[in-house]
Amino acid sequence: MAEHFLFIYNTDIIKNDPGGNEMAILEVNNVKKIYTTRFGSNKVQALSDVSFSVEEGEYVAVMGESGSGKTTLLNIIAALDKPTDGEVYLNGRRFSDIKEAEIAKFRREHLGFVFQEFNLLDNFSIKDNILLPLVLAGKQYHEMDKRLTPVVRKLGISELLSKYPYEVSGGQKQRAAVARAIITDPQLILADEPTGALDSKASDELLSLFSSINNDGQTIIMVTHSVKAASNAGRVLFIKDGRVFHQIYRGASSNEQMYQKISDTLTVLAKGGEHDA
């Protein structure tokens, strides 16, 4: 898990016109992903013409059964994988135009990551884990310290900074991971099953924290199997067989009403029903 973290830091809107929506911070246009076996004898299409956009300040959950393509989609948005065809834009910048040597810097400067298993480095203190993206970006200590204080205060982990990951709870680890994600002031936070390793109480606290961060203007995309987690989002995008199956917008719905809408859609999806995106 630590190696995965270091790799990332080191190394109903359907839209096809990248310049047509000035509010969109992220645009995914006709993205396909085909995996080929080692000797090229078999091909698996993980994504098929996926198109959607995310506006600045949106909180979008992505759901789908295992193997539906949602993790592949997240990896492409994270610039960890490349589409076979199609384009992804972040604030108008096309991913395919970014040179390989610049990808790690692009991730550090524009994306924040929150993982299911926290991906904290055990031999680093909580403070050092949070500051690591800034260290890798070459920031001066006084600037790092200036950014750290308001972030840890907001997340309620100021007293944990000198501790190590093995000395704190799962919920506290995930708060530290969120702090690490937002300390760079990213344009987009990508969360992969962020409540998956947490108990019910810690999950509720994390979801409340995500809502608070989103209310401050942070754009979030969260992949999740949890109906409860997804019901906190402003929009839920469902992936089935590598395609956008359906989207639900919160509107004036409460979390309870969103929960029911999501559950109903998942029931249709599980039965193999058809639904327009």
Go through each PLM region and give its residues.
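Conserved ABC transporter NBD signature motif
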Residues: 86-94
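Conserved ABC ATPase signature
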Residues: 164-168, 172-174
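The feature captures the beta-strand-to-loop junction immediately N-terminal to the Walker
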Residues: 63-65
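Short coil-to-helix segment of the ABC ATPase nucleotide-binding domain corresponding to the Q-loop/switch region
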Residues: 124-132
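A short, proline-enriched helix->beta-strand linker immediately N-terminal to the Walker B motif
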Residues: 183-187
